Amino acid sequence: MQNIHFIGIGGIGISALARFLKEKGFKISGSDLKESKITKELEKEGVKVSIPHHKDNILNKDLVIYSAAIKEENPEFKHAKELGIKCLSRKEALPLILEDKRVFAVAGAHGKSTTSSILASLLDDASVIIGAILKEFGSNMIYKESQNLVFEADESDSSFLNSNPYLAIVTNAEAEHLDHYGNEVSKLHHAYTQFLDVAKIRVINAEDEFLKNYKNESIKLYPSKDIKNCTMCIENFKPFTSFELKDLGEFKVFGMGYHLALDASLAILAALNFLDIETIRTRLKNYQGIKKRFDILHADENLVLIDDYGHHPTEIKATLSAAQEYAKLGGYKKITAIFEPHRYTRLAANLKEFAKAFEGVDELVILPVYAAGEEPIELDLKAVFPKALFVEDIKREGKFLVASKGQVFEEGLIIGFGAGDISNKLRQKNE
């Protein structure tokens, strides 16, 4: 049995790969800088996890796979190289992991986790590797003895080009992670074209500015024409979106917002290649959402607290639109957004867009930037967000939130945005 060690195993994407290979019969170990919910869960699943990194952790290993966050000076990476152990980045390891599978890969700047998750609910015989926790299964990985595998493909480091898709879905091709592409949008778009070209079946959002010009044969969704009568409702505080798709009738999906209808439509059009429409309509009801995507942590008649992974203006704007609809349906009079900016480079590149995205909220609270390893960039955020409340920290007290300056947030709809620590802050109760 091959011994595989993962450096940075606590990451949402790389932990899914570790889980998948463990199910395939490999002996898995891993390490990370600090303990987390994911590392604790992995240990319960029988994975030996070492905290922090130490060179001895890679002794007697046949292969080392490391996350994108790992630098060359990492003691385990350095020692593995010295010992001649084969080292692969997550990106380089994908062909090895996916080699014998029929891959249904979902890419795009926004909506890929949701679209992947919905597709996984529809294709219930497929294994799943995604960068989010499916509430239906309580994991970012599902292993099935099947040739089919639903995979969330990442364009940020061009690793989606290593996914060898049988079916490829692209939700949109908005410019994100341009630093990896030499700040040239044309290189990013060329990568998307390569990703699509490899696939036998292609499903695209044909109203995306780039994708609408894609030349090869594909199944095209024109959201403004194909999605009709999109309505939202709340049932026992749970959000649902209903819509009609082309001439296929009505569908109902867990979650709130037009973007949910769009993501679900792409998954439905993909699944139609393998399933009949009534099976799809029924299985769509199994989908229960994903963690950190309009994730309702507490709800009663006076207060609803929501955690959302949104960290780009486009995502935030779409989710706030859904939040406004939820507040209207639920009778919540005030909307408070708590924003933890993720990466200085993203914040600096999209300052005006972020300001615009938050225009509809009654109160905006801004936490310090989650740097994700980046060097700080000097930004005058108070000039861009003159009405915002800037706080050093926020913590959960029972069902309420308390800011470091003493402010208490206890009514209306409160929604947190960010890809850093904010989710933990919103979830860690101090009773």
UniProtKB/Swiss-Prot annotation:
| Residues that hold ATP according to the record | 108-114
GO BP terms in the entry: cell division; cell wall organization; peptidoglycan biosynthetic process; regulation of cell shape
Question: Which reactions appear under catalytic activity for this entry?
Answer: UDP-N-acetyl-alpha-D-muramate + L-alanine + ATP = UDP-N-acetyl-alpha-D-muramoyl-L-alanine + ADP + phosphate + H(+)
Highest taxon above the source species: Bacteria
Listed InterPro entries: Mur-like_cat_sf, Mur_ligase_C, Mur_ligase_C_dom_sf, Mur_ligase_cen, Mur_ligase_N, MurCDEF_pg_biosynth, UDP-N-AcMur_Ala_ligase_MurC
**UniProt GO MF annotations:** ATP binding; UDP-N-acetylmuramate-L-alanine ligase activity
Identify the pathway: Cell wall biogenesis; peptidoglycan biosynthesis
Give the record's GO CC terms: cytoplasm
> Protein name, please?
UDP-N-acetylmuramate--L-alanine ligase
List the source organism: Campylobacter jejuni subsp. jejuni serotype O:6 (strain 81116 / NCTC 11828)
